[in-house]
């Protein structure tokens, strides 16, 4: 807390939308899963303006860093995740209009290597979902599940679903890959967004 200029106090735990973060006054402290992604998100959110959305802004440490010893700090945005599906989609459209001009981060082009992290698992799953041959998308060194009926059924379903996909004509751009986990609602206030989980995919 002191690294981000916060005085000692009794922080309050928050939910999954804040990655299990802790609120101290108007600041939320959260542990990060990936330093590079956390710093990128903070840098983007620091200056990004999206009409009709409340973005959590990064709070830099006393020496100017976005991440300190695996922690980041952001301004608190009130609200809770709610099943307002149309509003989440609308928020995504507005956000992606604003992120359309952002360059592709280098880390989104890198292939995961052992030892794998949770972020790597999602990265590989994303690439498999878009690959022409999803089951061939796993890089060398990927952990394998033991043979089981569930695994065989999963492979069968993936193969079926892959055959139902249709090509998209929309260009790839910087998109938020976890809107339902990061969009907050409170009354009639504009939707809030706690973080940006970056992917390079078509926005529609």
Language-model segments: residues:
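A cross-family kinase active-site recognition segment
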Residues: 82-150
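Regulatory N- and C-terminal appendages and interdomain linkers associated
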Residues: 1-12, 33-36, 40-43, 47-51, ...
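Active-site acidic catalytic loop and adjacent metal/ATP-binding pocket
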Residues: 17-24, 28-30, 58, 159-203
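ATP-binding pocket architecture of kinase catalytic cores
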Residues: 17-107
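Phosphate-binding glycine-rich loops and adjacent basic patches that engage nucleotide phosphates
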Residues: 1-12, 51-61, 100, 104-120, ...
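Hydrophobic, well-ordered secondary-structure segments
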Residues: 85-92, 155-158, 176
């Amino acid at each position: 807390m002191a690294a981000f200029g916060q005085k000692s106090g009794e922080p309050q735990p928050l939910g999954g939308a804040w990655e299990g973060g802790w609120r101290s006054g108007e600041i939320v402290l959260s542990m990060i899963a990936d330093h590079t992604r956390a710093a990128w998100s903070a840098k983007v959110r620091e200056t990004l303006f999206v009409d009709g959305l409340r973005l959590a802004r990064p709070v830099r440490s006393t020496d100017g860093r976005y991440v300190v010893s695996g922690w980041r700090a952001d301004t608190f945005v009130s609200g809770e995740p709610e099943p307002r599906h149309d509003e989440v989609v609308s928020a995504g459209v507005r956000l992606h209009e604003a992120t359309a001009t952002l360059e592709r981060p280098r880390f989104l082009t890198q292939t995961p290597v052992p030892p794998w992290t949770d972020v790597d698992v999602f990265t590989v799953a994303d690439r498999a979902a878009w690959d022409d041959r999803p089951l061939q998308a796993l890089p060398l060194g990927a952990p394998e599940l033991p043979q089981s009926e569930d695994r065989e059924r999963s492979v069968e379903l993936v193969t079926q679903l892959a055959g139902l996909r249709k090509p998209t004509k929309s260009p790839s751009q910087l998109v938020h890959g976890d809107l339902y986990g990061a969009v907050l609602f409170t009354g009639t206030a504009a939707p809030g967004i706690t973080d940006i989980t970056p992917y390079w995919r078509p926005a529609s």
